[in-house]
């Protein structure tokens, strides 16, 4: 019984640590989406992790990838946060984004903590769940 209690207490503490970061993570994602909506790819690029910045090399290349590969992120009609979870030490924030055509998309934003704060280290479109608005 004592081991169970210690395990539960540890789980609650760890969960609190993960979800204590949620507001900051949401702020980073919101700021990047706002930059995309303003076509400010230079600002949007600053919210990407150093490894993502290294892959794309410039805000212009990054912007092209987003507008062509993730148009729902570039011009969302609606954004809903579905939950933050820890996937083996990597924090993943799930979002439901409705595009300009009214189609809903579920995406996972993978986050990494740097000296400058939280950065987006990748975005993955979750398998189509047939969502509409």
How would you name each of these model-derived features?
Residues 1-4:
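Positively charged n-region of N-terminal signal peptides that target proteins for export
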Residues 7-15:
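Bacterial N-terminal signal peptides
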Residues 23-27, 31, 41-88:
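Short solvent-exposed beta->alpha transition segments
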Residues 16-20:
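Sec/Tat signal peptide C-region and signal peptidase I cleavage site
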Residues 12-13, 50, 118:
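Alpha-helical transmembrane segments and their juxtamembrane interfaces
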Residues 83-133:
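Exposed beta-sheet edge and beta->alpha loop/turn motif
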């Amino acid at each position: 019984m004592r081991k169970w209690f210690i395990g539960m207490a540890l789980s609650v503490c760890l969960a609190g640590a993960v979800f204590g970061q949620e507001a900051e993570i949401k702020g980073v994602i919101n700021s990047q989406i706002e930059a995309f909506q303003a076509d400010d790819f230079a600002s949007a690029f600053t919210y990407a992790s150093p490894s993502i910045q290294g892959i794309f090399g410039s805000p212009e290349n990054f912007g092209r990838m987003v507008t062509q590969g993730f148009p729902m992120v570039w011009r969302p009609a609606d954004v809903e946060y579905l939950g933050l979870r820890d996937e083996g030490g990597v924090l993943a924030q799930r979002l439901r984004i409705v595009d300009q055509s009214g189609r809903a998309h579920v995406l996972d934003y993978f986050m990494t903590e740097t000296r400058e704060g939280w950065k987006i280290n990748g975005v993955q479109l979750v398998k189509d769940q047939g969502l509409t608005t």
